């Protein structure tokens, strides 16, 4: 039995979001659903298709029988309305203890110096990324550019380093999203886990069990 199902970076409203895979994962048996940031991407509902609304409907249904938590990401700044109608609890971060292990959840964008210090370039490249999506029906180019840009600015390593420096000594397991790079890194005093995203060809998520163990899964 999965105690906490952790997903992140679904980015509803974009064509690269792997929505069928999201629905498949949401059909697993779990007690708590924790969406670790960037469930949404665009608040123009004109860009939402039937599968986007189906996912939100699934979340709304789950919230009636499960704990459903949305930890805010940098694309979730105006998520209050949609979180309210879907029954999600909206938080900046989340901490819980399972079998004497302290788990800490935060999206990770706060530790991304690119967003913090270069907001205009962040806005520009995000716009370029979505423009390419319109013409790249296979999404291979847009995904490649996103992975390449993350590599150039070393976002995944910076996020991990700063995340661990701030929260590692107070918690046993740190869980982030944001970088779209699934990974597990073990340190002397904690473990850092990034759940990846649902915007790549191979999507990823994390299962946390009642004994405190966890797995990074791919679909």
Model regions and ranges:
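Active-site-proximal beta-strand elements of phosphoester/diester hydrolases
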Residues: 3-11, 102-109, 191-196
């Amino acid at each position: 039995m999965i105690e906490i199902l952790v997903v992140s970076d679904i980015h509803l409203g974009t064509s690269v979001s792997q929505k069928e895979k999201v629905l498949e994962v949401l059909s697993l048996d779990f007690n708590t659903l924790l969406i670790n940031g960037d469930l949404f991407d665009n608040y123009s509902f004109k860009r939402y298709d039937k599968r986007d609304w189906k996912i939100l409907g699934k979340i709304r249904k789950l919230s009636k029988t499960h704990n459903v938590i949305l930890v805010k990401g940098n694309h979730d700044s105006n998520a209050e309305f949609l979180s309210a109608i879907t029954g999600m609890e909206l938080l900046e971060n989340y901490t819980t203890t399972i079998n004497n292990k302290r788990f800490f959840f935060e999206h990770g964008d706060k530790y991304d110096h690119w967003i913090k210090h270069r907001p205009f370039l962040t806005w520009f490249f995000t716009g370029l990324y979505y423009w390419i999506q319109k013409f790249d029906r296979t999404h291979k180019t847009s995904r490649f550019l996103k992975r390449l840009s993350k590599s150039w600015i070393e976002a995944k390593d910076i996020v991990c380093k700063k995340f661990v420096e701030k929260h590692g000594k107070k918690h046993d397991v740190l869980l982030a999203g944001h970088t779209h790079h699934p990974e597990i890194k073990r340190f002397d005093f904690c473990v850092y886990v990034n759940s990846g995203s649902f915007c790549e060809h191979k999507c990823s998520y994390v299962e946390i069990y009642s004994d405190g163990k966890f797995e990074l899964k791919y679909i």
